[in-house]
Amino acid sequence: MTNITHLLGEIKDIDETLKVHKLSKQDYEEILKILKRPPNLIELGIFAAMWSEHCSYKSSKKYLNGFPTKAPWVVQGPGENAGIIDIGENLCAVFKIESHNHPSFIEPHAGAATGVGGIMRDIFTMGARPVASLNSIRFGDISDNGTLGKKHRYLLRGVVEGIGSYGNCMGVPTIGGEMSFESCYNGNILVNAFCLGLVKKDEIFYGKAEGIGNPVIYVGSKTGRDGLGGAVMSSDSFSSTSKAVRSAVQVGDPFAEKLLLEACLELFKQDLIVGIQDMGAAGLTSSSFEMAGRSGSGMTLYLDKVPMREEGMNPYELMLSESQERMLICAKKGCEQQVLDIFAKWEVDAAIIGEVTKSGIMELFWYGEKCAEIPIAQLSENAPMLDMPLRPVAVQTHKANQLKTSQSAQEIFITLLGSVEVANKRWVYSQYDSSVQSNTITPAGSGDASMIRIKGTNSALSMSVDCNMRYCYLDPKNGAKIAVATSGRNSIVNGAKPLAISDCLNFGSPHNPEVMWAFKEVCQGIKESCKVLNTPVVSGNVSLHNQSDGVDIYPTPSIVSVGLIDDVSKVVSSTFQTQGNMLVLLGEIKAEFGGSLAQKILEGHIYGQIPSIDLTQEFALWNLMLEASDECMLSAAKDIGEGGLAITLAKMALGNGECQPIGCNVHTHLPSQLLFAPSQSCIIVEVAGEHLNTLKQKAKQHKIAFTEIGCVGGDIFCVDEINISLEEMKKLYFESFEKLIAQDL
């Protein structure tokens, strides 16, 4: 038995203790009011974790209010472990995106791996089997020839290995994602992990603890000291000395999680439990307080009953450890042994560590001695909200309607196609198992959205993650609108109707008034776009304090759009299909280069107005595309993105490298620089001749510009003055990124 006298007495140096726990004097005054006495160290640690930015959203919550969260197909919106939408045939999709930025910068492999593990637990804790994963990862100047580039290539390799190793061991396919490189991430990379699962509509479980006397059961890996202070660490800034917090990074074991997953799914088939919650950030503290808080209950925990991996652990460590692969269950009274037997069958630790009470109080005991007593509602539901100061940043109003370069269109094309931003990332996604479970239709690198079929039905789900952080830096509100629209458009081009989004809002320091103004603007942009596009927000995550040595990242709202197609045979390809088919531009190319990839690469900096977006026009384009794909008019489609029309056509020609590329002959009659303009609400479609007039009429009905620009065919890529062989394009597109990564090996 570990002596805990030092944890129960009066805190001697309160100022230093508050500093270590990232609590303010005002926080401490509030704690005194709640407890009506000074806290002991255990209680102070619990308050620090639950009131951290990571757990409480104290700086951001006020701006999230007003997100559209309801629709006839929404079963569960924000507030639970994940969002849920009805996809028909008594099935629901459960999904969420979440950040694991700070841990991944400190220990890239472990940080990324546990990020994947944590988001998977959020999904299967609701009764769903995970069936697909995505990721959005962002690094600094990876092309730098010095130590900075070497460092970020190391970080990239570690993150990719961590994502791949965990997902592959879990048997969950990683089917897509996005990757970006900007100097703003030099001191703070981003690793956002997304997971989607499927569950029957009448078999959903929630994170609640109710029913007086119901037992509270700990299941999963034993608790160690890894991850101590993780929630507080994730709510703090980085500096050049941040390597000292390695101990706050959790250590994952995907094999243990696989056993936990299967044991939980077996448990869900029987009527044995009331609720279940993942032990994520803040570990046993957050799971217990959140479960009881949602139900208005109290709870008693006997911490000496918690399975421990290390000797000499104390209540402070047990409550705040973020050891991975652990869950907390509220079982039905009298069903304890059946629950324990299921986990014993799967060789997963399980122990009864407490019970639900009616007190509304969390009471913690250590070998019969009460060591903490805290009102639950004050921590779980009523954390202090901060009204951080805002300072608007002038959105640039001058138009960037041309690229300041003397390069020809051919030279610009070659530069962009081989750039680290555009070049194919098969070195990355080849490390992910994208075909396990045998449901994948379009894996990473094969389509604008990634798609899986829904077993036992004729339907398929699409999912895509997107955010152009340069746009959000220059114009946060409209940049966020573009992120929502683009993520949904990626599903549209493959034939699926977007139904809902999950967002991961990555920002710098909330103490910087300009950062909080950008946060407010981004939230407003998301609200407006989701309302017009009818894609409610059902889950999400906020990650603040993404800055290092005073340098904030660009505002980066990673948006995942999830869509549904009723007939899997109507999925539209993103690559050229048939020689002789016509190519059509839907939408209008405009001279808008502010924040574009071409501007960044060719001019060395970004400035000016970002591409404009008309959400009503965007929605009309979606409806046109859904009609056309449903009537099987489209052979292929791809939206115009980074690099403009020329790069979009190049990707359609080259595909993912597994099939023979097909050339094209295109004459746009556009000024040459406009071939690289990333205009919004624009899609290239491949159409057989017999469907051309019908599609043209439909475009007219929806008031969408329709321009025939050429045809598919040949072994030359010819787009206006760009004329290049497919072999040369393949070399640039498929080898550039791999060469960059290989230089350190």
Swiss-Prot record:
The keyword Coiled coil appears for this protein: no
Q: Which positions are annotated as binding Mg(2+) 1? A: E98, N541
**Record: residues binding substrate:** S99, H100, N101, H102, R121, Q250, E322, S323, Q324, S543
InterPro entries tied to this protein: PRibForGlyAmidine_synth_PurL, PurL_linker, PurM-like_C_dom, PurM-like_C_sf, PurM-like_N, PurM-like_N_sf
Q: What is this protein called?
A: Phosphoribosylformylglycinamidine synthase subunit PurL
Give this protein's Gene Ontology molecular function annotations: ATP binding; magnesium ion binding; phosphoribosylformylglycinamidine synthase activity
The task this protein performs is described as: Part of the phosphoribosylformylglycinamidine synthase complex involved in the purines biosynthetic pathway. Catalyzes the ATP-dependent conversion of formylglycinamide ribonucleotide (FGAR) and glutamine to yield formylglycinamidine ribonucleotide (FGAM) and glutamate. The FGAM synthase complex is composed of three subunits. PurQ produces an ammonia molecule by converting glutamine to glutamate. PurL transfers the ammonia molecule to FGAR to form FGAM in an ATP-dependent manner.
Q: In which pathway does it act?
A: Purine metabolism; IMP biosynthesis via de novo pathway; 5-amino-1-(5-phospho-D-ribosyl)imidazole from N(2)-formyl-N(1)-(5-phospho-D-ribosyl)glycinamide: step 1/2
Q: Output the Gene3D superfamilies linked to this UniProt entry.
A: PurM-like C-terminal domain (3.90.650.10), PurM-like, N-terminal domain (3.30.1330.10)
The UniProt keywords, alphabetically, are: ATP-binding, Cytoplasm, Ligase, Magnesium, Metal-binding, Nucleotide-binding, Purine biosynthesis
Q: Write out the coiled-coil annotation as residue ranges.
A: none
Query: Assembly and partners?
Result: Monomer. Part of the FGAM synthase complex composed of 1 PurL, 1 PurQ and 2 PurS subunits.
Q: Which residues form the active site?
A: H54, H100 (proton acceptor)
- Residue positions binding ATP: Y57, K96, D503, G540
